[in-house]
Amino acid sequence: MPTAIPADSVGLVSPQVAHFAEPLTLACGRTLADYQLIYETYGELNAARSNAVLICHALSGHHHAAGYHSEDDRKPGWWDSCIGPGKAIDTDRFFVVSLNNLGGCNGSTGPSSTNPATGKPYGADFPVVTVEDWVHSQARLADRLGINQWAAVVGGSLGGMQALQWAISYPERVRHCLAIASAPKLSAQNIAFNEVARQAILSDPEFHGGHFQEMGVIPKRGLMLARMVGHITYLSDDAMGTKFGRGLKSEKLNYDFNSVEFQVESYLRYQGEEFSGRFDANTYLLMTKALDYFDPAAANDDDLARTFEVAQADFCVMSFTTDWRFSPERSREIVDALLAARKNVCYLEIDAPQGHDAFLIPNPRYLQAFRGYMNRIAV
């Protein structure tokens, strides 16, 4: 609970829900007859409607990117360090929109929603969704809000992929595209990590083929293991060494397999336990599959430069030196393709010890660079 909401916070915010009755045909060939998207806004839309910024979330993200839902909240939104008055995404200048994507588990239509055809939760029957599907649904939300063009579309990790897809799918609707700690497609290693996480969930006896809600259970063990695998990839070796080293939780070895002996074990189990209590297993499967499928250059014979030729936006690409999940080399692939396509691009490689999670952490150099780019965007 904050003793007082900070002056540079957007303050108390309330989610809003947009309902869509127009069917949305997905890349998998299936159609959502109707659906809803939950979102939050921060700042004010100007008279020209030229100052809107879209925030795209990563795998476990959601619509609550900044501020507090109540004065009793212990923590603000997941990107509060970057969104607010005077911050990198300055809400005194910008009207910021953040939503929970289709297939999510925080209020937008997803596997835990009721399937109108059966009256039961969708569960495993919810269709596989892609980054392109998300961008098309986000475009409909923009239409609903009266936003013809985004001043910027911004995202980190999977969110950065959505920002890139926006610049490709709706080039006339994006003035600036910011892709942070992202990649033009997943490497084989990243797909492998996702598959291990999925198998942890699928092999949990409580998964019940994805219809665990009807059984009144959750695949807690599988979700815990999936999250533990994920967290290993989000942190750098240096960050884990500095934070935990080989420190013991109780100053002694127990010579068994059931005790939590090392501090890093305790950390991973805590993260897995916390995550399994708030996230939906089917959503986790969907998000990782959307990551695996993202490959915009596939439609152009794997020519990323040709893929970006349609873009009209200016680009800012940021990476972090110790990120081995989406390494700086992957960001430079994006930059090289943009340059080959003769696009305006700013590239920032930021020295940060935290690994992939660095895009969520208020590193002064990162925030300064982020703010510097956003400040040059005319509204």
Curated annotation (Swiss-Prot):
Pathway: Amino-acid biosynthesis; L-methionine biosynthesis via de novo pathway; O-succinyl-L-homoserine from L-homoserine: step 1/1. GO terms for molecular function: homoserine O-acetyltransferase activity; homoserine O-succinyltransferase activity. The active site is at S157, D323, H356. Signal peptide: none annotated. It catalyses: L-homoserine + succinyl-CoA = O-succinyl-L-homoserine + CoA. It is found in: Cytoplasm. It is an enzyme of class 2 (transferase). It holds the Pfam family Abhydrolase_1. GO terms for cellular component: cytoplasm. The record marks R325 as: Important for acyl-CoA specificity. One of its GO terms (biological process) is homoserine metabolic process. Its EC number is 2.3.1.46. Residues 51-360 form the AB hydrolase-1 domain. Substrate binds at R227, D357. Keywords: Acyltransferase, Amino-acid biosynthesis, Cytoplasm, Methionine biosynthesis, Transferase. Belongs to the AB hydrolase superfamily. MetX family. Transfers a succinyl group from succinyl-CoA to L-homoserine, forming succinyl-L-homoserine. Homodimer. This is Homoserine O-succinyltransferase. It comes from Stutzerimonas stutzeri (strain A1501) (Pseudomonas stutzeri).
